[in-house]
């Protein structure tokens, strides 16, 4: 392609920028051949003419299409160059917050300087087993790739982590080791993975320090080999260290610190155990205060020191050794603070003997003070003939002291590393290993010394190895695809390496100069200039004669030669070392022991003897100092580095390059300049260059065809089956240069930039099609607009014409209406005048006629009143006469009747004294007495009434007589006067009175009318106001009721949810304990299997521990408590079974019981909360009395049954004795002839029998009377309205009735015993008996009446108290109502709600008390019923025994009785020795296929029938042994078939059925509600197997968890492929370019690809097996709920970790797949299982991928819809969202920030991924069987002939 084709208008390019390194621009016009510049538009819309040089290829870099921006693999970019790489990393880091990016085989990790939630266990499990290219870049993906290649290729692996200080190397290496520790955890309980992780805090403490660039910088390199066995479990580890920066011990730059351990020890100096160290704060010591800053922000040195100590303890370092280590570290601090004083001559110096620090140094190391004081200031010179002791200058002494301190620390460092390696070693054979190399990256500072030189030398070696490995992989890919390839020219840094390590190279010359006695750094620098001045990688600075420049692969570095010789020699004087060797502390002496045969700290030959690579020590053996053969530091480092490279070359390397984004340690801040420097230094750009030199872009033929089919012509698409030839023909027509692409076996290979060119052609094609579509659409829109305008114009015309017509019509109507109005008005005016004249005439006539009538009225009125007066006077006189006569007659009648009554009473009293009357009235006498008494009372009352009436009449009569006399006298006086004058006066007075009355009447009428109107108006107002108040009151009441109902329902719902949640959590914790126990049990068995040897015998301690623990509790009613029984039990069970009885299980069992009790309490509480309070109130009001009545009736019936049973027993005994006496009499008559004694005894017995019958009748009579009285009292109580009084009476009544009945019974008995005293009254004594009975009855009735009166008085008082209480309550309510009226409406509602809540609370408390009382009464009655039932059974047994004895006495000869064959009772009998055979045939060797066509869960039924027979025979040991053997047998079967779904489901269903049988037939009433009478006969009689039910429940939980694990293992490989990758809807998924990861070794050819139908088929298999095995439907629902949760978790986790899966088409595919799974659930009737709810997060994620993501409304819709997704998950999906084509926009950063702002109030968990290992707690609901035990038949295929049916 020409430049004119590439650089056309709208093409975007990169140009250099001094601030941002690279800047984006866009061409404003096409480039033409010959142009010397490009016209560019920058991002700020400025126009720039950019000069170019086409001849020298100096043109700006092309920018990749937007669809490629943000790729997780840099090699997937079409244009591979520095600005593209930098921009892609910046976009991923800043916009998507992705810190990991692939660059071919390299993982680029950018330090975020912030804690991210992407390293948890859930993330580890998500990456485990996944291909490296399938998931988002992560350190876990690299670790998984290494682990997978180690297992697949059986080759050792290495992970090389590099980067400059502060880039995150140590953290990355730590997470890689954590991944291996989690995924490859040790199979045995050795905690080796914990020890590997525990080494990190130790090495950080002694090898890390604060620098200017990093607060936790590793100042040494380390290579950790993690060893694996053949099963790829971690068995051990080994560590090798490189180039510890010893100079930091004695010197630190400004704002830097020494190693962390020094400051940690100073922070803990106040602890009691460290008092002898004599330490103070770090500022007081020279070695720790040199940098100026002794603290790190956010770091607690004391806390870190405690972690270091814990890690040392975990790795087996004894406490004494730890103290010794801390003493050595403290001694180094004291040594650095020793004051050295120079003498006057300047050639010598001295140390004060009283120097405190030197004394502490010698004391802590256990050496001689004087010797160390001397040899610190002197040195020994040895010649061939003599030995000299020479003084040293101050500078020499300081250097010697510093060298000694560095040497001590280095030796201690090596000793600690050696000890860590010993702790991580194992005796098992190592099969392979994975090495993690955490080594310093390329470094360059203003002043670079020996350390930087060694570091950069190591990076040169690693870069060489890296380049060769990348080149090798690139060539392998070409050879695999069978395409021609040429040698790629890549940078080879071997010349630079030769400059450093070759003969007479820099290191060789340095060693030679060190051997010269007078060698100096300046001489060495001159030799370098002379020797290597012509080398292309060596330069001499212009302004310096002591520095030199080495051109490394990353950059030029200038080294200052000062200090090279001293650091390379690392001189320590022999005399000082000898003093340390003589230390009295073993550890100090051991550090400096000169033993050539000892294993150095980093020697790994023995620990890796089985490894494929024999790696020698990285640190050569230390020889005596100052010897000629002592190796220099440079030589040691070169040797160890060569060994490291040999190890790495023998392994498969994996690279992690850590990038430091900024120097200020700001979170998610990207500095392009610093990033580019590190990209150049770490080899990322070299990887890009190698990839760009070949064919970096690779497409499969299928993907290329789908992506670029728009560029193909119609004739080329005729045959779509041969896609390979179609792609070839298209490419040859589109790209003319055949060198730009190659056709491989399965892929098409493109040169750099070709994919971008194809994308440009594709975009141009779409642009042309878009223009055509726009043209057509615009024309159509214009036509539609014209038609709409024309139609609108016609409509306007039509409406205007219609409007004019309607206006004319309206005018005509108005004119006609005006005429009509005028006519009507004129008529109305004339009518009004006529009506006025007529009304005046009528008024005049009415007044005239009224005046005439007024004149005629007075005479008529006077005559009428006189007539009325006469009428009333005559009537009064007649009535008075009649009343006098009637009163006289009544008095006479009363006197006569009183006389007759007295005579009758006297006769009755005489008659009552006679005996005949008593005899006649012996029955019902008390009723007659009561009737007579009532009659007398009535007569007395009547007499009293009549007497009062008589006196009243007499007094009235006397008053009337006096009044009449007065009137008569007045009348006579009036008659004597003049009658005419009197009449005139009367008439005149009457007239005046009449006028006055008229006037008063008028006034009163007017006032009455006014008041009446006012009152009516006021009444109407009040009625209206009252109606309003009533309506408002009703409305408020309804509102209060609604609010109270809503609040109560809401509170009850919340409480129910809370209780359910607590119950689920408790159940989950319990089942996790069961799971942990099974894991501990498995570990115990594994350890036991490992430790067992052919000659092994248990020691006494083991034997006792095994025999003392018991896994299963005793089941008998009397527990086995002594040691002999326990030993016997162990012997019977067997050693293997007894070995399972562990102390851990007993503790867990105890915990299980406690949790079960808490669960029951919570369940009861939940059931109580779910009851409706109103229903409880109604039921208690309706049934409160019935309960007590039933209790009383039941009590009386039980008493009666007890008396009847005792009576029957006495009667039977009497009959038996009677017959026995008769038999004896017959024998006596045969021998003796004197029957008198027999007849006398017989008569006495007859008399006693008759007396017994009489007593029986009397008891019946009394019982009838008592029951009648009880009924009367109950009926009287039922008439009472109050509920509380009703519920409080029965208990007292029952007590009184019981006492009365007992007293009556004893009284009758006493009466019967005294009947002979009354025998003189008549011949048979019946009269006396009757009289005594009546007397007792009368006493009884009198007592009952007294009790009733007392009770009635109490009830009256109680009712009065209740009435008072009700009055007070009414007053309170009235006051409350008045107060409520004064409040505002809102306050009224709130006040009403509070009052209603308080009332409901009080009522609930009352009801709870009543319920508790009734429950106690019920329990008491149940206990009494059980006692009486037991007595009845005993009586029946005694009667049966007596009858059998009687039959035995009656039989006089032997009779042979034919027995029927007994029916099968549902029990199976077996002998003790057949138990092992039973378990083997029924459990161990049983196959589920053998029971096809039989009853489901047949083994469970058979086992229960065997248990039932053992219970029937009361054999405790047999039941215990059988259940223990069954449980152990099931465990063995499950362990053997731990991957067989069918076998596991078979035993899950049988274990649950056996558990249900033990519940159903346990005899507990709660489990017997659905049993038939026949099934109740099959209940256990002797044993309580409650604790065994708990053991079986735990076993069921374990089996369920194993079943879920098997099912998940079968489903998990299908989920990602079927749910995310397979195209369920064809044609939706687009195709994107793939990166290097998709073609790396992580991809395996021929990987299985699953579709959704595979998951559905697997689900159908699970469902069919579970149903065929007879598993409970409730458990089946829980199984599929768990499986659907796992599908949801795995799919969502992969979606959150895969950028290629977050697209619109994936959302469509997910919705379709989920709908298919929901349809399957409905088809299997599993929609109630809650499985759909578990898929809710995935459903919302699919909807999120399909929603619009632009505006504020879209953000609100997303927040309201995605309620099941956490904030982190929503943001992660939006960050990962990737458009599939160039026409769909990316999600902007501002939109994501808007989502975060709206979701910040959510309290979501800080967990990104779902826990795919989470398991819902399983619940086994009780499911009784309808089968009876006697209907079960055993098939012959089970070989159980030794079982006998009983």
Swiss-Prot record:
<feature type="domain" description="IQ 2">
    <location>
        <begin position="789"/>
        <end position="813"/>
    </location>
</feature>
<feature type="domain" description="Dilute">
    <location>
        <begin position="1524"/>
        <end position="1801"/>
    </location>
</feature>
<keyword id="KW-0653">Protein transport</keyword>
<keyword id="KW-0677">Repeat</keyword>
<dbReference type="GO" id="GO:0098685">
    <property type="term" value="C:Schaffer collateral - CA1 synapse"/>
</dbReference>
<dbReference type="GO" id="GO:0036466">
    <property type="term" value="P:synaptic vesicle recycling via endosome"/>
</dbReference>
<dbReference type="GO" id="GO:0098871">
    <property type="term" value="C:postsynaptic actin cytoskeleton"/>
</dbReference>
<dbReference type="GO" id="GO:0035255">
    <property type="term" value="F:ionotropic glutamate receptor binding"/>
</dbReference>
<dbReference type="GO" id="GO:0098944">
    <property type="term" value="C:postsynaptic recycling endosome membrane"/>
</dbReference>
<feature type="domain" description="Myosin N-terminal SH3-like">
    <location>
        <begin position="8"/>
        <end position="60"/>
    </location>
</feature>
<feature type="region of interest" description="Disordered">
    <location>
        <begin position="599"/>
        <end position="629"/>
    </location>
</feature>
<dbReference type="GO" id="GO:0043025">
    <property type="term" value="C:neuronal cell body"/>
</dbReference>
<feature type="coiled-coil region">
    <location>
        <begin position="1334"/>
        <end position="1450"/>
    </location>
</feature>
<feature type="modified residue" description="Phosphoserine">
    <location>
        <position position="1444"/>
    </location>
</feature>
<dbReference type="GO" id="GO:0098978">
    <property type="term" value="C:glutamatergic synapse"/>
</dbReference>
<keyword id="KW-0112">Calmodulin-binding</keyword>
<dbReference type="GO" id="GO:0016020">
    <property type="term" value="C:membrane"/>
</dbReference>
<feature type="domain" description="IQ 1">
    <location>
        <begin position="767"/>
        <end position="788"/>
    </location>
</feature>
<protein>
    <recommendedName>
        <fullName>Unconventional myosin-Vb</fullName>
    </recommendedName>
</protein>
<dbReference type="GO" id="GO:0055037">
    <property type="term" value="C:recycling endosome"/>
</dbReference>
<feature type="compositionally biased region" description="Low complexity">
    <location>
        <begin position="607"/>
        <end position="619"/>
    </location>
</feature>
<dbReference type="GO" id="GO:1903078">
    <property type="term" value="P:positive regulation of protein localization to plasma membrane"/>
</dbReference>
<dbReference type="InterPro" id="IPR001609">
    <property type="entry name" value="Myosin_head_motor_dom-like"/>
</dbReference>
<feature type="coiled-coil region">
    <location>
        <begin position="915"/>
        <end position="1272"/>
    </location>
</feature>
<dbReference type="GO" id="GO:0045179">
    <property type="term" value="C:apical cortex"/>
</dbReference>
<dbReference type="GO" id="GO:0031267">
    <property type="term" value="F:small GTPase binding"/>
</dbReference>
<dbReference type="GO" id="GO:0060997">
    <property type="term" value="P:dendritic spine morphogenesis"/>
</dbReference>
<dbReference type="GO" id="GO:0032991">
    <property type="term" value="C:protein-containing complex"/>
</dbReference>
<feature type="compositionally biased region" description="Polar residues">
    <location>
        <begin position="1100"/>
        <end position="1120"/>
    </location>
</feature>
<comment type="function">
    <text>May be involved in vesicular trafficking via its association with the CART complex. The CART complex is necessary for efficient transferrin receptor recycling but not for EGFR degradation. Required in a complex with RAB11A and RAB11FIP2 for the transport of NPC1L1 to the plasma membrane. Together with RAB11A participates in CFTR trafficking to the plasma membrane and TF (transferrin) recycling in nonpolarized cells. Together with RAB11A and RAB8A participates in epithelial cell polarization. Together with RAB25 regulates transcytosis.</text>
</comment>
<dbReference type="GO" id="GO:0016887">
    <property type="term" value="F:ATP hydrolysis activity"/>
</dbReference>
<keyword id="KW-0505">Motor protein</keyword>
<keyword id="KW-0963">Cytoplasm</keyword>
<dbReference type="GO" id="GO:0048471">
    <property type="term" value="C:perinuclear region of cytoplasm"/>
</dbReference>
<dbReference type="GO" id="GO:0071806">
    <property type="term" value="P:protein transmembrane transport"/>
</dbReference>
<dbReference type="GO" id="GO:1903543">
    <property type="term" value="P:positive regulation of exosomal secretion"/>
</dbReference>
<dbReference type="GO" id="GO:0099159">
    <property type="term" value="P:regulation of modification of postsynaptic structure"/>
</dbReference>
<dbReference type="GO" id="GO:0005737">
    <property type="term" value="C:cytoplasm"/>
</dbReference>
<dbReference type="GO" id="GO:0098793">
    <property type="term" value="C:presynapse"/>
</dbReference>
<keyword id="KW-0518">Myosin</keyword>
<dbReference type="GO" id="GO:0016197">
    <property type="term" value="P:endosomal transport"/>
</dbReference>
<dbReference type="InterPro" id="IPR036103">
    <property type="entry name" value="MYSc_Myo5"/>
</dbReference>
